[in-house]
Amino acid sequence: MAQPTAVRLFTSESVTEGHPDKICDAISDTILDALLEKDPQSRVAVETVVTTGIVHVVGEVRTSAYVEIPQLVRNKLIEIGFNSSEVGFDGRTCGVSVSIGEQSQEIADGVDNSDEARTNGDVEEDDRAGAGDQGLMFGYATNETEEYMPLPIALAHRLSRRLTQVRKEGIVPHLRPDGKTQVTFAYDAQDRPSHLDTVVISTQHDPEVDRAWLETQLREHVIDWVIKDAGIEDLATGEITVLINPSGSFILGGPMGDAGLTGRKIIVDTYGGMARHGGGAFSGKDPSKVDRSAAYAMRWVAKNIVAAGLADRAEVQVAYAIGRAKPVGLYVETFDTNKEGLSDEQIQAAVLEVFDLRPAAIIRELDLLRPIYADTAAYGHFGRTDLDLPWEAIDRVDELRAALKLA
């Protein structure tokens, strides 16, 4: 069947939990969760580096808790699947170095005693906690999928999750932990997905694997399975370009193939390039860092805007100054998809009325002082169909519509 004419092609990628950068994200968030579990007020900024045979954990922490970081690192590596020198990395025998210092007192003072509190004295409790850094954060939502995510990144994540599942469950034998997926969709003149154009999967594997066999297995157990599970068969009826390990063999992977670092997959973590990004990474950071908590809040805001029927797509930007509680800026963009005769400025005013975007309020409303972060380290922080994440709640729809005087 001939494919519909495409106005544009858009591509997003995902990676598996065995990718070197994702190993680092997982280790950093595992340490964060362990500290929050024992001391919810922990301040954590932990970065991880992995390379051949060794893991380096560095950063700054303020906490009353003690956790055995080397053991946490080893357990996470083994859980991911790096449990033997044959696969290129062994969590049981690799080196682990830890260099963690105390959080800067100046940063701590700015978070614990905001500029508003120092200047005005008697302020609301939520005005006392300042942002942990300056910066800008974006949130995005679209109604092109049930999870309010862009279809390219949503499908790329589903493919990565399934690739890991078939490896761990032995559905497709001889796979190793490292892997990447990439999806290209055609979009029509109405800027809606019209058909699936290209799927790329690169997966680490054992030396004896035949490439033709691997392609057959991954087409059946990963690509076809995901297309059916996602319910997008109508977008996959034409000729789809499928590329499995297009570089050839992929035996050497994980930290032996490439060094990894926390925070290097920020587009994979968010919207696959469909929305703007403020530049701040998430993993290893406690929610006093607005890089993380405010980005989650912006997703919450954007998703509720779209779920309320105010727009088909929404992108929301917020900005903070270090040590200040109140945001210094908020911006709503609906890309001319706004409904009900509303302007972006009206939607923005409703957001300010309905959502409290001070860091302390975000942390309280989303209940962020909990060990919920390690599960987000791979396969995206937004639109997760396999996790119950508080920033994915559609719980302000009625309030937004009421603020805009809509029935």
Curated annotation (Swiss-Prot):
Q: Which GO terms describe its cellular component?
A: cytoplasm
Give the signal peptide range. none
Q: Where, by residue number, does K(+) bind?
A: E47
Which residues are listed for L-methionine binding in this entry?
E60, Q103, D258, K289
Subcellular localization = Cytoplasm
Write the record's keywords in alphabetical order, separated by commas.
Answer: ATP-binding, Cytoplasm, Magnesium, Metal-binding, Nucleotide-binding, One-carbon metabolism, Potassium, Transferase
Q: Which reaction is the catalytic activity of this chain?
A: L-methionine + ATP + H2O = S-adenosyl-L-methionine + phosphate + diphosphate
Q: Where is this region: Disordered?
A: 107-134
Please state the pathway this protein functions in, per its UniProt record.
Answer: Amino-acid biosynthesis; S-adenosyl-L-methionine biosynthesis; S-adenosyl-L-methionine from L-methionine: step 1/1
Gene Ontology terms for molecular function: ATP binding; magnesium ion binding; methionine adenosyltransferase activity
Any binding details for the cofactor?
Answer: Binds 2 divalent ions per subunit. Binds 1 potassium ion per subunit.
Which EC class is this protein assigned? Answer: transferase
Q: Where does Mg(2+) bind?
A: D21
Q: Does the keyword Metal-binding apply?
A: yes
Record CDD domains: S-AdoMet_synt
Identify the main location.
cytoplasm
What EC number(s) is this enzyme filed under? 2.5.1.6
Give the residues the record marks as binding ATP. Answer: H19, D178, G179, K180, D258, R264, K265, A281, K285
Query: Region entry Flexible loop: which residue ranges?
Result: 103-113
Protein task: Catalyzes the formation of S-adenosylmethionine (AdoMet) from methionine and ATP. The overall synthetic reaction is composed of two sequential steps, AdoMet formation and the subsequent tripolyphosphate hydrolysis which occurs prior to release of AdoMet from the enzyme.
Subunit-level organization: Homotetramer; dimer of dimers.
Descriptive protein name: S-adenosylmethionine synthase
What is the originating organism of this protein? Corynebacterium glutamicum (strain ATCC 13032 / DSM 20300 / JCM 1318 / BCRC 11384 / CCUG 27702 / LMG 3730 / NBRC 12168 / NCIMB 10025 / NRRL B-2784 / 534)
Which gene is transcribed and translated to give this protein? metK
